[in-house]
Amino acid sequence: MLDIEGTVLPISYVKAEMFPYARRRFRTYLLENYEKEEVQTQLGALREQHQQLQLVGASCPAADEGATLSHALELEEASRDRDHALSAKRLIVGCAVKYLEALTDADVKSTALKEIQGSIWHEGFLEGELRAPLFADVPGALARWTRLGIKVFIYSSGSKRAQIDLFAHTNVGDLSEHISGYFDTTSGAKVSAEERKSFFLEV
């Protein structure tokens, strides 16, 4: 089982390239895809994330931004007039962007954030704007393990979609054939011993 950052590619690529890439596109992505079920699900997950932050007494700025987002979503649900709905949409997207930025800055391992980042990165990989710069020894190691019949799994805080896209769009081509499965934050925390046991049972 491999991690991604610092294991198969430089941490700096994720921090300096991928995170800013998604951050610059939060607003455009949400506005252009607002009516899609996927985005509505992601916005709902953001609200749930805020509620979880409240439960644990989080004091980071993300908690305050989440409160504003939750209020905006409530306003939209209560609106019946089209003009009010459009105003609510703009308010929600604006609040969501601030919340996503706050989560990013606070380095909160938010599944909701990771899903939205993954959707944005998906477009970037398909358009050729993103390419994963693997360490030089990674392609050979993956190929060697495949020849030996050793299964390789990935576990990262990034969404499964992001992981799949990353290995399918590397600086040396598509290496996804060497990966047997992917785990993300929906599978549990990296620091949880019980979750690690469940991974081994699954693979």
What is each PLM-predicted segment?
Residues 118-119, 128-171, 182-185:
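Substrate-recognition element of Asp-dependent hydrolases with the DxDx(T/V) motif
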Residues 192-203:
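Conserved Lys-Pro-Asp/Glu-containing loop-to-beta segment of HAD-superfamily phosphomonoesterases
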